[in-house]
Design a protein with these regions (language model features):
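Conserved acidic, metal-coordinating active-site core of Asp-based
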Residues: 103-105, 109-218, 222
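Non-catalytic pre-domain segments flanking phosphatase-related domains
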Residues: 1-8, 27-30
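Active-site phosphate-binding/coordination module
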Residues: 21-123
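Short active-site oxyanion
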Residues: 36-40, 59-61, 150-151, 213-214, ...
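Short, acidic loop-to-helix structural element flanking the phosphoryl-transfer center
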Residues: 19-36, 83-90, 130, 134, ...
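Mg2+-dependent phosphoryl-transfer enzymes with acidic/Ser/Thr/Gly-rich catalytic loops
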Residues: 1-5, 22, 188-270
Length: 270
């Protein structure tokens, strides 16, 4: 069988609503990998919030984090990894205008650290950042922002997160890629201009000498649109946002709480 690259979003797609992998999904992904297909976790999460799933699935393939800002082979030092950043001025500006965007919190995300405006468990769930509790070193302070972040993450009270993303993209003259993330949570992520899951997957396809038609992708949210459009075959989850549906070739028969990805992969390969 011709080998495929299978790009898998995590939240709302591979993970259930409790942010867990079922045993059925784990077993299925292992079988798919054993056939030689390249399973690529493709997520808005930083690596520290995705590595547990990578290990559970026993993957040895590259991973895409921060919606495309970081493409790397976990635990390995490789010269061909891609780590992209955005100008720190955008982080400082968003913090200065946090009331305008109705932000509960704003965080600057780096490969191995983050700074958050409100390190308070009543405002932000520490687990959203892959930790059990916030520490003093996580507190945002303009003086600490000495380097450019991989992305900016914030939660908003705005009723329509998609409209806010569009408004902010216009405000910053499309010098950023601003997308929604986090399934049902009102979370927006800001990445460097033209950086998306699709741009990272294009980079990987080139590195692995694979064709775009051999890419299969699964997603559920606005930040998966480019990825599904790029793929030879893009699947929107049964539980996907309606925003994603025009970009999908198919919709899975089952939701993320029903092992929708695993069941579709079994139909395709097992």
């Amino acid at each position: 069988m011709h080998k495929k690259m299978i790009a898998l979003d995590l939240d709302g797609t591979l993970l259930n609503s409790e942010s867990k992998l079922s045993d059925f999904t784990i077993d299925t992904i292992k079988k798919i990998s054993a056939l030689g297909h390249k399973v690529i976790i493709t997520t808005g999460r930083p690596y520290r919030m995705a590595h547990t799933y990578y290990k559970q699935l026993e993957l040895d393939t590259p991973m895409i984090n921060f919606n495309g800002s970081l493409t790397h082979l976990p635990e390995k030092k490789r010269g061909d990894e891609q780590c992209l950043t955005l100008d720190k001025k955008y982080l400082l500006d968003m913090v200065a205008n946090r009331d305008t965007i109705q932000a509960d919190f704003i965080a600057g995300e780096y490969r191995n650290k983050f700074f958050i405006t409100d390190p308070n468990e009543h405002v932000a769930d520490p687990k959203l950042f892959g930790i059990e509790s916030f520490q003093p070193e996580n507190q945002f302070n303009p003086e600490r922002v000495t380097s450019d972040p991989n992305c900016i993450l914030f939660q908003t009270k705005a009723e329509d997160k998609y409209a806010l993303a569009d408004e902010m993209n216009r405000h910053y003259d499309y010098n950023l890629s601003i997308n929604t993330w986090g399934g049902p949570l009102n979370i927006l992520e800001c990445n460097p201009k033209n950086v998306t899951k699709a741009s990272a997957l294009t980079y990987l396809l080139d590195k692995l000498n694979m064709d775009q038609k051999d890419l299969i992708a699964f997603g559920d949210e606005h930040n998966d649109t480019d990825m599904l459009a790029l793929a030879g075959h893009g699947y929107a989850m049964k539980n996907a946002s309606s925003v994603l549906l025009p970009y999908a070739d198919s919709v899975t028969d089952f939701t993320n709480n029903e092992d929708g990805v695993a069941r579709q992969l079994i139909q395709l390969f097992l």
